[in-house]
């Protein structure tokens, strides 16, 4: 019996949101390897407003250590170049017409270790978010059982479903972290 007041799918969606947020945060970590997602946080002063870089240019990865930014509007090349330099990513563009080429410098071992620590912090924050969702779900189930809207057997079954969803979400977070850690530490 599925209670109308308790939706396991909503809990799963909220847990999935935590791992999607982690994926986005990990995407912003520099690994010494070129990735178009590195430039996602870059905001460009264009047409009187701040715009994401991906609304003004196409970012490609022609080589493992090179990003290519093809600016669509010739008048925006300088603004895009300035935004990349000001973004504190440690990248300096070489401009050729409407194309900016960004060499990705090698990361030293200390910087790699720092990035791994940051990745672990992001992953722990995601795990905590998942645990909060689990706690909310278990509290809701307990209230439903106390008010006799569900039976004790249903409570136990729903508790197990919530735990299974939690284990699955934590496992996904651990896989994302392991993958990013390997990517960062690969020289």
From Swiss-Prot:
Swiss-Prot/TrEMBL GO biological process terms: cytoplasmic translational termination
CDD domains: RRF (cd00520)
Highest taxon, organism lineage: Bacteria
InterPro entries attached to this UniProt entry: Ribosome_recyc_fac, Ribosome_recyc_fac_dom, RRF_sf
A Pfam family the protein falls into: RRF
GO molecular function: ribosomal large subunit binding
Listed Gene3D superfamilies: 3.30.1360.40, Ribosome-recycling factor (1.10.132.20)
Protein's UniProt keywords contain Cytoplasm: yes
GO cellular component: cytosol
Main localization, broad class: cytoplasm
Keyword Protein biosynthesis: yes
Key words of the record: Cytoplasm, Protein biosynthesis
Location(s), subcellular: Cytoplasm
Family membership noted in the UniProt record: Belongs to the RRF family.
Function, in words: Responsible for the release of ribosomes from messenger RNA at the termination of protein biosynthesis. May increase the efficiency of translation by recycling ribosomes from one round of translation to another.
UniProt-listed HAMAP family: RRF
Name of the protein: Ribosome-recycling factor
Organism: Rhodopseudomonas palustris (strain HaA2)
Lineage: Bacteria, Pseudomonadati, Pseudomonadota, Alphaproteobacteria, Hyphomicrobiales
Gene name of the encoded protein: frr
